Amino acid sequence: SIVHPEPGVWKWDRVEAFLNFSNANNIKMRVHGPIGPQSSTWAKTDSRTAEELSELYEDFLTELCKKINGNSNILWMDVVNETIDSNGNWTDKRNGTNQWENPWTQIGKNDDGIPLYIIKAFEIAQQHAPDISLIFNQHAGMQPAMWNKVKETILYLKNKGLRVDGLGWQGHLRDNVVLSLNQSKLNYLFSIIDWAHENDLDFHITEI
C-alpha cells in the first residue's frame, strides 16, 4: 500500500531506509507480508478488475524481489500473509475501502480452487528471489479448519514444483493479555510445528 499504491506510482524510500539500516548495522531482516490484506485504497476499490489487480501486484512483487534479492541481510520473505480465515475460508474481498480485506481473491481461482494470486506470488518469488527463504505466513489461533487449509495449500504448491521453505505463524502473544494457549492449544501448536518439520519446512513465529 506504500511502495506501489497504484499504477505508475512507486515509493521506495521506506524500503531503502530499512535496507540501508540493516546493512549499516549488520541486522538480519525478514520482508513481511508483501501480498495479503494490507493493501492500498486503490486495490480495495470495488470497481477494480481482475486484470488491473493482477498487473499491479505482479509488478510490485517482481520489483520488490529484484530489489531485496542478493542482500545478505535479507534472509526471509513472508510471500503471502493472512490468506485463510479462522473458519478455513479464503480471506476475501469486502465492500468499500476502509475494511480489513483481501482484494486479490478477485483475480480468481484455478480448477483446483486455489486462488491464482497465491500461486503466482510463489512463482514470482521463486524466480526473482532465489537467495531468500520463502515463507507461507498465517495469523489467528489454533483453529483446525484453518490450519488444515494452510497445510493443504502448502502441499499443493510444493507438489506443483514451487518452493515453499517455511511456515510462519503470527503468534501475537502480547504481555498485556492472558495467553490463550492452554495445554490443549499448545499441544496443537506443537503438532503444527512437527508437521512443518516432517514436510521439510522451517517453522517461524513471525509476530510475537
Regions found by a protein language model. Name each.
Residues S1-I135, H139-G141:
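Substrate-binding cleft and catalytic face of glycoside hydrolase catalytic domains
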Residues D13-A24, P103-N137, P144-I208:
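Glycoside hydrolase catalytic-domain groove-lining segments
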